[in-house]
Amino acid sequence: MSTEHVDHKTIARFAEDKVNLPKVKADDFREQAKRLQNKLEGYLSDHPDFSLKRMIPSGSLAKGTALRSLNDIDVAVYISGSDAPQDLRGLLDYLADRLRKAFPNFSPDQVKPQTYSVTVSFRGSGLDVDIVPVLYSGLPDWRGHLISQEDGSFLETSIPLHLDFIKARKRAAPKHFAQVVRLAKYWARLMKQERPNFRFKSFMIELILAKLLDNGVDFSNYPEALQAFFSYLVSTELRERIVFEDNYPASKIGTLSDLVQIIDPVNPVNNVARLYTQSNVDAIIDAAMDAGDAIDAAFYAPTKQLTVTYWQKVFGSSFQG
C-alpha cells in the first residue's frame, strides 16, 4: 500500500480548496447570526414576558462541519407559553409574527414561513437564516420539542447537548474529526447528485464517524480514515446499532424493529435512521463499496494520473491531486 501520489496532505489541501467553508465566509455567517441573537436578547430585556426565549445557532455552521456550498444558516428559537400553537402551520405563522415584532426593522417579506422553518433574509448579503421553532417548557439543558422534517412529529431535543456531543469528538481529534466529517459529507453530496436513489443524512454520517472515533479509529490520516468509514458501511451493512452514552445509559433504549438503528445521543427514543428502507441501505452500501474499492485501487496505482482518476471516483472531477 502506498500514498506516494496522493497522501494525507493532498486530501487536506483538496479539503481546504474545494470542500471546506472558507473561514472568512464562516465568520461572516456567524456574525450575521449573532446580530439576530443580539436583537432578540435586546428585545427580551425590554419585554421579559415575550414568548421567544432564546436563539441558538445549530446545524453544520455551529458544529464546524459546514461545506463550501453552504448558503444559509440554521438557528433554533425556543418558544415558551401556553398560547403557542401545537400544529406545524400554526406554529410557523406564530413564530414569523413574533420574529417580526422582535425585528421591527425587517420588512414583512424578509420574514417568511417555509415548510419546517421561518426564513429571515438579509438583503445586503443575500444570506438566509432558517429559524426552526423549539417548544420549550423549562426543562434542564434547554430540552424542548422540535418538529421532525421527516414526518412532522414532535421530537425532544437539546441543541446545547448536541453541540456538546460534537465538541467532545472535536476535542478527541482536534481538527481531524470535523475535517473527516466534511469530506464524508462532500462525498455523500456528490452521490446524491449522481445517484437518484441515494440519501444519507448528514446527522447519520456524523454519528457513524463519532462511533468510529470512539472505537479508536485514527482520524489524523484522511485517506485511511475515509477507508475505515466506507469499510464500516460495507461490512456492517448498517445493521449494527449505534448508541452513545454521553447523556443516558444504553439500557434506556428499548427493543426496535427498525432496519437501521442510529440513536440520537440526546434522545434515546429517537432513531434518526428509522425511515431508511432496504433500498436506501443498498444504495449507501453500493456507493460506499465503490468508494472503498477506488481508494484501495488508488493505494496501489503505479502512476499519479491513475491515482487521481481513482480518487475522482470518490470526490468527483474537482479533485485534481
From Swiss-Prot:
Molecular function per GO = 2'-5'-oligoadenylate synthetase activity; ATP binding; diadenylate cyclase activity; double-stranded RNA binding; metal ion binding
Per its UniProt record, what InterPro entries does this chain match? CBASS_cN_synthase, NT_2-5OAS_ClassI-CCAase, NT_sf
Where along the chain is ATP bound? K63, D74, H162, K185, K201, S202, F203, N270
Name the Gene Ontology biological process terms: defense response to virus; nucleotide metabolic process
EC number(s) on record?
A: 2.7.7.-, 2.7.7.85
Q: Which GO terms describe its cellular component?
A: cytosol; membrane
Q: Which UniProt keywords apply?
A: Antiviral defense, ATP-binding, Magnesium, Metal-binding, Nucleotide metabolism, Nucleotide-binding, Nucleotidyltransferase, Transferase
Which Gene3D superfamilies does this chain map to? 2'-5'-oligoadenylate synthetase 1, domain 2 (1.10.1410.20), Beta Polymerase, domain 2 (3.30.460.10)
Regulation affecting activity? The 2:2 CdnC:Cap7 (Cap7 is also called HORMA) complex is activated for cAAA synthesis by long dsDNA, but not 40 bp dsDNA or ssDNA; the 1:1 complex is inactive in vitro. The 2:2:DNA complex is catalytically disassembled and inactivated by Cap6 (also called Trip13).
* Essential cofactor(s): Mg(2+)
Q: Which residues bind Mg(2+)?
A: D72, D74
- What reaction is this protein's catalytic activity? 3 ATP = 3',3',3'-c-tri-AMP + 3 diphosphate; 2 ATP = 3',3'-c-di-AMP + 2 diphosphate
**What does the record note on quaternary structure?**
Forms complexes with Cap7 with 1:1 and 2:2 stoichimetry, and a 1:1:6 CdnC:Cap7:Cap6 complex.
Q: What does this protein do?
A: Cyclic nucleotide synthase (second messenger synthase) of a CBASS antivirus system. CBASS (cyclic oligonucleotide-based antiphage signaling system) provides immunity against bacteriophage. The CD-NTase protein synthesizes cyclic nucleotides in response to infection; these serve as specific second messenger signals. The signals activate a diverse range of effectors, leading to bacterial cell death and thus abortive phage infection. A type III-C(AAA) CBASS system. Cyclic nucleotide synthase that upon activation catalyzes the synthesis of 3',3',3'-cyclic AMP-AMP-AMP (3',3',3'-c-tri-AMP or cAAA) as the major product, and 3',3'-c-di-AMP as a minor product. Cannot use GTP as a substrate.
PANTHER family tied to this protein? 2-5 OLIGOADENYLATE SYNTHETASE, C2H2-TYPE DOMAIN-CONTAINING PROTEIN
Q: Which NCBIfam families match?
A: CBASS_cyclase_a (NF041116)
Q: Which family does it belong to?
A: Belongs to the CD-NTase family. A01 subfamily.
UniProt domain comment: In the disassembly complex (PDB:6P8V) Cap6 (also called Trip13) crystallizes as a right-handed spiral; the top 4 subunits bind ATP while the bottom 2 do not. A CdnC monomer lies along the surface of the hexamer at the interface of subunits 5 and 6, with Cap7 (also called HORMA) at its tip, over the central hexamer pore. The N-terminus of Cap7 extends into the pore, contacting 5/6 Cap6 subunits.
* Protein name as annotated: Cyclic AMP-AMP-AMP synthase
Its lineage opens with: Bacteria, Pseudomonadati, Pseudomonadota, Gammaproteobacteria, Enterobacterales
